[in-house]
Each structure stands twice: as structure tokens, then as C-alpha cells.
Amino acid sequence: MIRIGTRGSLLATTQAALVRDALIANGHPAELVIVNTAGDQSSASIDSLGVGVFTTALRAAIEEGCVDAAVHSYKDLPTADDPRFTVAAIPPRNDPRDAVVTRDELVLAELPAGSLVGTSSPRRAAQLRALGLGLEIRPLRGNLDTRLNRVSSGDLDAIVVARAGLARLGRLDEVTETLDPVQMVPAPAQGAIAVECRAGDSRLVAVLAALDDADTRAAVTAERVLLAELEAGCSAPVGAIAQVVESIDGEGRVFEELSLRGCVAALDGSDVIRASGISTSGRASELGLAVAVELFELGARELMWGARSDRARGS
């Protein structure tokens, strides 16, 4: 029996159940084990709780032998490698885009100036402010039902959340608008899940590897290398989106390339720096590094230091 560690939220257990069911379909009995994390036990902002708020307890459960593997929302994993563990599988990614849910079924551009928009993410907040719509951004915590209820109750006019979460819980009918990544660059690895286990457990690594999707792994690798090179945590105002796309060479032959777009935003929305690049899936890490270097050359370091200062002051 493969014991799969997961947070206890409905979204987390739904994601983990996809992995469990895939393992069972492949002939490997599996079960879910709920692990409480610091992020689930605190109502403080994610930014204030620090790196690994949703993942440290799951990794500890693996190390202590309480579970054999853990399922993470990949965007929650620290970018620094931990040699004790390996991401043995990255299943096919769900839609990585952000989605808007409004009380009056308006799209974002139709919301009146001064509308209250909730988000848990400095990245979303910064990019929303950069749109220049005069929206009032409010902090947002809690599970997905809690967040949606803040709109239906009239507490907020709108929220911006990951479309993937709504899809996994069968709540896409709540979506008013799905934001184009050009308008709102998603978080690195948004919509992807990571299945992690002990690095030395070669048998389990091989079993889990059957669930891996090569295109998803290439995309999130490029995105997370960019994030790591910027030395920005998962709560930083950094966006990145990569995808495998088809291109045609000079002789009309179709081939695949990996494209990557990244951005760094000032928290007040006064500036957004963007860069992009294209390479092959086999050079995903090099692509992430190259786009990060371009962002640095355009002034990303100064913009991020300003964002860190703003967060330290509580603005």
C-alpha cells in the first residue's frame, strides 16, 4: 500500500485523489493520509508565514516514514533543491491561468473604480494595480468555498483565484472571466501538482514516474528556474508561464519548442517588467535562466527590492 500524504483541504485531497486513483489504475494499491500544515493552522498571511508553509510538514511526514509520498501544489514547493527528496512525477497540468469571479457577472474591465477585489497573492495584486482600473485590492485567505462566499455575501465585489482550483472542484460555472496570460501572468507552476518521495526510494520513484507528463515537467522546470534565479519566493510578485508549442521550419516541417514568458511587478502596480524566450524542452533550465537574466538586465532586481521593502512596511 502506497501512503500518499496530503493537506486536508478539499482542493488538496481532490488533487491527491487523482494521484491515488492513477496509481490504483496502474495496479498499485494506494491511500491518502491527511497531514496538517502550518498554513492550514494559521489565519496569518502566507507571506508572513515564510517559505514552505504548506510543504514542510508533508516533507517531514515522508522523512519520518509516516507516508511514502506527498502531493503538493507545485507552486507551493520551495525552489531550493532538497537532496532528501525528489519530484518523481508531475502529472498533466491543469489550466494555469487566473480566473475572476464577480458578484454581478461583470468582467474585470467592467468593474467600477473602487470595487473591492480579493486576492491572496502579491503577484495578482501587483498586476491588478498595473491594469489601472482603480480597483481596491483586499487580502483573501481561507479555502475556496470561503473565498467564493466573500463574493456571494457582498463582502467583496470580485476575487481572483487560480482557474485550476475551480476546475478540480467542479466550480467553473462560478467563473466570470479567465484572464489571458498576457494580461495576468500566472504564478510559476500554477495549475501543476508535484508528487514527491524519498530520493533513495528507487522502486517508488519508478512507480510514480509512470504518472509523469514530459511537457508539463519541461514547462514548470523553466518557470521555476526563472523564479529561483530571481531568488524570489512563491509569494513574490513574479509571474512565469511556459508551454510547449508547435512551430514550422523553413521546409514546412512541424516541430515543438518551449516558450517562456516572465514578469516582475512593483507591488503598487507602477511598473511591470516583462521578458520572454524560446528554446527546446530539453533545455528548459537554460531557458528559465536566460529569461531571468533578461529580466535582471531590464531592472527586475531593483523592482523586487522595492517590493520587499513595501512588504516589510506592510504596504
Swiss-Prot record:
GO terms assigned for molecular function: hydroxymethylbilane synthase activity
Gene Ontology BP, a term: protoporphyrinogen IX biosynthetic process
EC number from the UniProt entry: 2.5.1.61
Modified residues (S-(dipyrrolylmethanemethyl)cysteine): C234
InterPro entries reported in the protein's UniProt record: HemC, Porphobilin_deaminase_cofac_BS, Porphobilin_deaminase_N, Porphobilinogen_deaminase_C, Porphobilinogen_deaminase_C_sf
GO cellular component: cytoplasm
Top-rank lineage group of the source organism: Bacteria
UniProt pathway: Porphyrin-containing compound metabolism; protoporphyrin-IX biosynthesis; coproporphyrinogen-III from 5-aminolevulinate: step 2/4
Pfam family name, one: Porphobil_deamC
Substrates-to-products reaction catalysed: 4 porphobilinogen + H2O = hydroxymethylbilane + 4 NH4(+)
Annotated keywords: Porphyrin biosynthesis, Transferase
Record note on cofactor: Binds 1 dipyrromethane group covalently.
Coiled coil stretches, renumbered: none
Cofactor field: dipyrromethane
Functional note: Tetrapolymerization of the monopyrrole PBG into the hydroxymethylbilane pre-uroporphyrinogen in several discrete steps.
Annotated family: Belongs to the HMBS family.
Binding partners and assembly: Monomer.
Protein's UniProt name: Porphobilinogen deaminase
Species per Swiss-Prot/TrEMBL record: Mycobacterium leprae (strain TN)
Lineage start: Bacteria, Bacillati, Actinomycetota, Actinomycetes, Mycobacteriales
